[in-house]
């Protein structure tokens, strides 16, 4: 398994809160586990600003997003979710 870099909490209440985004920079590949069974694999590069990675949930609920990869190489991390764990 990948080392965990960040755990982010997102709550979908309705269609207005359906999307969450994560932005970061990494020269190494990371995987994003969105908490609903969906995974974006081998994401790397400048994923900030307009290149931020986003995900839209179809069902209401609380989701925990895990950004996993080489811990030391993920920088400039931002999200519109709530960061639960900074590093594990």
Placement of each model-derived feature along the sequence:
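N-terminal capping/linker segments that flank leucine-rich repeat
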Residues: 1-88
